[in-house]
Amino acid sequence: MIIRAVPVGIGHYLPERVVPNAEFEAMEGLETSDEWIRARSGIERRHFAAEGETTSQMAVTAARKALDHAALNPDDIDAVIVATSTPDLTFPSVATMVQAGLGMTGGFAFDVQAVCAGFVYALANANALIVSGQANRVLVIGAETFSRIMDWTDRTTCVLFGDGAGALILEGRDSAGTPQDRGILSTDLHSDGTHRELLYVDGGVSSTGTTGVLKMQGKEVFRHAIEKLTKTADTGLAKAGVTVGDVDWVVPHQANIRIISGTVKKFGLPMDKVIVTVQDHGNTSAASIPLAMSVGVGDGRIQPGHLLVTEAIGGGLAWGAVVMRW
């Protein structure tokens, strides 16, 4: 017998403010349209955090929903991992703020920063903690307020991103170790820092002393995304001992519909096996995968025993995949 990290609870939170593409059409000097945005990204609307609403507050709300779904109390959690690139403060971590917000009195907490690949990296960390016996239950959260780092004069980026949070609870359970058993079957992580200029924020504590805004070379990111996401997903499946034909759902990072459809096509799967939420959420960076998972579970598409592939790529570049049996 071995220990598997099994999903036992999930939840998400989206800010109240819904921003349709029409709001960007009305912005002076931006020169964009609903048709232009939909054609290039598939995005119809996104959610923006209210003034004063923080990443940690959204993370706490999503976490409470995941705890309710799992019928657990905060003190049942051994560790909290938050994937985010938009923390409330330089320090302490958002994860410790979540601990405080939930009223947790024990365990440990830390943040992971891999931008849009953050949730995949956080899942891999949580899995390692569980299978090594260092934690039994881990609360894994992706939460972002990307609306705070947008360049509102750049139509190629500001229309793409949204805010939100998603939370998943993993629990260690005995397993025979077969691909048919529930839990995380494999993880596959990569990064290449030589591509920093393709996607970054031009501010920081030790450099400019400012928050900065997001900068992206979209065409180059697209090219790397299709190649790297397909390869990491293939590797993840091979590590798990399963094939593309075994996959019930792909739950990708919701970057834009072109990257999602291009990757899945190269992967050899139809779009009806993909959980797509980008039209409603935009790109919520590290929050996008748990948001999509939560929607898929909530509407009944994702069922116990289903085989899921999650994959993501973000600034760094950093990318990876996780294969799990729900």
Swiss-Prot record:
It is found in: Cytoplasm. It is an enzyme of class 2 (transferase). Pathway: Lipid metabolism; fatty acid biosynthesis. The keyword Cytoplasm applies. GO terms for molecular function: 3-oxoacyl-[acyl-carrier-protein] synthase activity; beta-ketoacyl-acyl-carrier-protein synthase III activity. It catalyses: malonyl-[ACP] + acetyl-CoA + H(+) = 3-oxobutanoyl-[ACP] + CO2 + CoA. GO terms for biological process: fatty acid biosynthetic process; secondary metabolite biosynthetic process. Keywords: Acyltransferase, Cytoplasm, Fatty acid biosynthesis, Fatty acid metabolism, Lipid biosynthesis, Lipid metabolism, Multifunctional enzyme, Transferase. Gene3D superfamilies: 3.40.47.10. The keyword Transferase applies. GO terms for cellular component: cytoplasm. The active site is at 116, 253, 283. Its EC number is 2.3.1.180. NCBIfam families: fabH (TIGR00747), PRK09352.1 (NF006829). Catalyzes the condensation reaction of fatty acid synthesis by the addition to an acyl acceptor of two carbons from malonyl-ACP. Catalyzes the first condensation reaction which initiates fatty acid synthesis and may therefore play a role in governing the total rate of fatty acid production. Possesses both acetoacetyl-ACP synthase and acetyl transacylase activities. Its substrate specificity determines the biosynthesis of branched-chain and/or straight-chain of fatty acids. Homodimer. Belongs to the thiolase-like superfamily. FabH family. This is Beta-ketoacyl-[acyl-carrier-protein] synthase III. It comes from Jannaschia sp. (strain CCS1). The gene is fabH.
